[in-house]
From Swiss-Prot:
Family: Belongs to the class-II aminoacyl-tRNA synthetase family. Phe-tRNA synthetase alpha subunit type 1 subfamily.
Organism from which the protein derives: Flavobacterium psychrophilum (strain ATCC 49511 / DSM 21280 / CIP 103535 / JIP02/86)
EC number: 6.1.1.20
Gene Ontology molecular function terms on file: ATP binding; magnesium ion binding; phenylalanine-tRNA ligase activity; tRNA binding
Subcellular location(s) per record: Cytoplasm
Record's cofactor remark: Binds 2 magnesium ions per tetramer.
Name of this chain's protein: Phenylalanine--tRNA ligase alpha subunit
Length: 339
């Protein structure tokens, strides 16, 4: 009889299942009211006295092993049921996860930074909430200067000397105040102007402005720098500089690139001329250098600026600037391949 019980012990040890029904069959077979353990205990009275001790030990071992097996497998099955209730069927194929992407403004900004970094320009940043000195006065725009009207400004009501910057030229002022020439830096960032929101303009937009200060810097140096940029950014090798006015540069110019007239869109955006304005530039006014603590008799330089949205609209052929700020997933997910 003892040998038979040992066979049952081996069977109980070897038992394994992931099925509740089979586990219940095992429990009934070994531990049920008519199971093996109970039947074997009923035979205890017929065992010779000299074998009762060994018989009792073996049958208790069978009972313990069967109970532990039922307990262990039950816990495993309950754990899997809990995981399944929390996470679903883990064997099912996963659902498609929408991958995010960089915003088109960030893509263009980073591309501009890379282009100018290749020729030695670093990146400088500054506060979006500025004071009058850094945004206007230091840039040759003293109080009551008529050129201030060129930029409709958001002032802080409780302190009119504080405002939302209208250009990133304020960053260049701060950079010149804290760094000695030679200076070669670009200042990308968000700017604010009190303008009507339309398909072509917005009260919030992004600029990148560049500054190069050194000895014997020429207008030709500026032109070659801008020509390099337009080749890298647009693949265009023809630019022109039209005379213009900016209070912080003298002489000043508008930057045009020859876009071409290959499509109907080209005719529309260039008004039939083939030329397209992308920004402004000029030689830094000596008064600006003096205001920033740089001696204009020793150093000179050039500055330029352009709108990042303007460039993004050209490259991605986007017709409405408002699309950059509406957070429409149908628009933004078109750029996910370029993250």
């Amino acid at each position: 009889m003892t040998d038979k019980i040992k066979e049952y012990i081996a069977e109980a040890k070897a038992f394994s299942t992931q099925n509740k029904e089979k586990l219940e069959e095992f429990r009934i077979k070994f531990l049920g009211s008519k199971g093996l353990v109970k039947d074997i205990f009923a035979e205890f009275k017929n065992v010779p006295n000299d074998q009762k001790k060994e018989f009792g030990q073996v049958i208790n071992l069978l009972k313990t092993i069967a109970e532990e097996k039922v307990k262990t497998i039950t816990e495993e099955l309950e754990s899997k049921e809990e995981i399944k209730s929390l996470y679903g069927d883990l064997s099912r194929p996963s659902e498609h996860i929408k991958i995010g992407s960089r915003h088109p403004i960030s893509l263009i900004k980073n591309q501009i930074i890379d282009i100018f970094s290749n020729i030695g320009f670093n990146v400088s940043e500054g506060p979006e909430i500025e004071d009058d000195w850094h945004n206007f006065t230091a840039l040759n725009l003293p109080e009551y200067h008529p050129a201030r009207d060129m930029q409709d400004t958001f002032f802080i009501q409780t302190n009119p000397d504080i405002l939302l910057r209208t250009h990133t030229s304020s960053v260049q002022v701060r950079y010149m105040e804290n760094n000695k020439p030679p200076i070669r830096t670009i200042s990308p960032g968000r700017v604010f102007r009190n303008e009507a929101v339309s398909s072509r303009s917005h009260c919030i937009f992004h600029q990148v402005e560049g500054l190069y200060i050194d000895k014997d810097v020429s207008f030709a140096d500026m032109k070659q720098t801008l020509l390099y940029f337009t080749k890298e950014m647009f693949g265009k090798s023809k630019i022109r500089l039209r005379p213009s006015y900016f209070p912080f540069t003298e002489p000043s110019a508008e930057i045009d690139i020859y876009w071409g007239l290959k499509t109907e869109t080209d005719y529309r955006i260039t008004k039939g001329t083939g030329w397209l304005e992308i920004g402004g530039c000029g030689m830094v006014d000596p008064n600006v250098l003096k205001n920033c603590g740089i001696e204009p008799d020793q150093f000179n330089g050039f500055a330029f600026g352009m709108g990042i949205e303007r460039i993004a609209m050209l490259i991605y052929q986007i017709g409405d600037i408002r699309m950059f700020y509406e957070n429409d997933i149908r628009f933004l997910e078109q750029f996910k391949s370029t993250i």
